[in-house]
Design a protein with these regions (language model features):
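Iron-sulfur (Fe-S) cluster-binding segments and ferredoxin-like electron-carrier domains
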Residues: 18-28
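Short, internal active-site loops enriched in acidic
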Residues: 57-58, 88, 217-222
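Auxiliary Fe-S-binding modules of radical SAM enzymes
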Residues: 164-279
Length: 279
């Protein structure tokens, strides 16, 4: 679930998908709203991950952040906590020793950074990122493809290689959301997929982000993947690689496919699928 704990940001991005919500001077969620959110998470055991967002969660004070993380970590079924933040980009001095201690205390806490251009990976930003990962806080990056800003494979590969060198995993490469006033910043799906297609030929899997689009009206994320399959014949599939090389892949006959022993994992899986609350 997404837990919005503030509407304040350290910088207000022109392409923000929540511009209707941010900047309303609510530095921290009202206490009654906070208690209601915590109670909701407690009462829904299907919730395994909580994403702290806003606004930027790292604009709140250390004591408040410690309280939020502590309350979430006390909920037995919450396994992973994520924090989405632009602070490592625009205000890396926020990554203090005290902050790192708080994040480490409530592990596992993942920091989801938002670097969009290789020029944003400054020496100060690099120092903040290394302080996080050196202390066991995993960092993953979510970038947005922006027309006229970073919509070229040369820029995307430079960004992701620099981040990976700093032990930051490139995670998402988002299609810019159709927010009001952002048409001039949006790339076409075709152009975005062509960027991804070129990256696959020149980046390792570790450096490769997942191209994704947020479907409007609550449809959730959908991966955008170039289709390399050219034909099928029975158990044989034909592919054309990113470099234009044609190849075929022969699958085992269906009668040779065996189901593994599932034990208690099947019950866990069925519970996950039947949970009414998305995780």
């Amino acid at each position: 679930v997404l837990f919005l704990i503030t509407d304040i940001c350290s910088v207000y991005c022109r392409f923000c998908t929540r511009k209707h919500f941010t900047g309303q001077e609510q530095a921290f969620i009202r206490n009654d709203e906070y208690e209601k959110a915590i109670a909701y998470i407690k009462s829904h055991p299907g919730i395994r991950e909580v994403i702290l967002s806003g606004g930027d969660p790292l604009t709140v004070g250390d004591a408040q952040l410690d309280r939020v993380l502590g309350d979430l970590r006390a909920i037995e079924h919450v396994e992973i906590i994520r924090i989405g933040s632009r602070m490592p980009v625009v205000c890396p001095m926020r990554i203090t020793d005290d902050l790192v201690k708080i994040l480490k205390k409530h592990k596992p806490v993942f920091l989801m950074s938002h670097f969009n251009h290789p020029n944003e990976v400054t020496a100060e930003a690099a120092a903040g990122l290394e302080k996080l990962v050196d202390n066991g806080v995993p960092v993953m990056n979510q970038m947005v493809l922006l027309n006229g800003v970073n919509n070229h494979p040369a820029l995307v590969q430079a960004l992701n290689r620099r981040l990976l060198f700093l032990r930051v995993k490139p995670y998402y490469m988002f299609q810019c959301d159709p927010s009001q006033g952002t048409d001039h910043l949006r790339t076409s799906i075709e152009d975005s997929m062509e960027i991804q297609r070129e990256l696959w030929g020149h980046l390792s899997g570790l450096a490769m982000p997942n191209l994704s689009v947020d479907i409007p009206d609550g449809g959730g994320k959908t991966y955008l993947v170039p289709n390399y399959e050219t034909a099928r014949e029975g158990n044989t599939r034909y592919y054309k690689g990113w470099d234009g090389v044609d190849a075929k892949y022969v699958s085992p006959a269906p009668e040779k496919i065996k189901k593994p022993e599932l034990h208690h994992y099947l019950e866990e899986w069925n519970n996950l699928k039947s949970a009414k609350t998305p995780v």
